[in-house]
Regions:
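Phosphate-binding site recognition
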Residues: 1-154
Length: 154
């Protein structure tokens, strides 16, 4: 039996954002070890979701890892084998794929992407405005370095 306790309000908020018409962007941040990733994992358990855990590696290494996750998510050998130098191409491939239900894209430890490439928050803002916002997709940005998350996302 699967048990998930004391996060009903947060789950309802995420579900409400998911059910909105069009796109939704959710920023979830807080101290380490308070259950943010567990909350997200529970929320996406029955959804069509791509979960990416960023690392403290370089921007290029994170982009390559995200490309692999995206290629697996949309089942695209073309994307998997492509030499992708831009985050835009990966996000465009994700939203251009066909889905039975609204896809959810989770970028966990988002602050590491901004740490590896200081321009990443503005790059992501452009991707949101030009690609993601115009589609029916939910994006969750999650992080634990509170000051960095606030400066990068709010």
């Amino acid at each position: 039996m699967h048990v998930f306790v004391d996060r009903q309000q947060e789950m309802e908020t995420l579900q409400s954002e998911y059910e909105r018409n069009g796109s939704a962007l959710v920023v979830l941040y807080g101290r380490r070890r308070v259950g943010k990733t567990t909350l997200i994992s529970e929320f996406i358990r029955d959804k069509n979701a791509l979960f990416f855990l960023a690392s403290e590696e370089s921007e290029a290494q994170n982009r390559a890892a995200f490309k692999e996750k995206a290629a697996e998510f949309i089942d695209s050998e073309l994307l998997r084998n492509a030499d992708v130098k831009s985050w835009d191409v990966i996000f465009k491939a994700i939203v251009d794929a066909k889905y039975d239900s609204k896809p959810v894209i989770v970028l966990d430890e988002f602050q590491y992407l901004g740490k590896a490439e200081p321009a990443f928050p503005s790059i992501f803002q452009r991707i949101w405005e030009e690609i993601l916002k115009k589609q029916s997709v939910m994006v969750i940005l999650c992080g634990s370095l509170i000051s960095m998350m606030e400066s990068q996302t709010l």
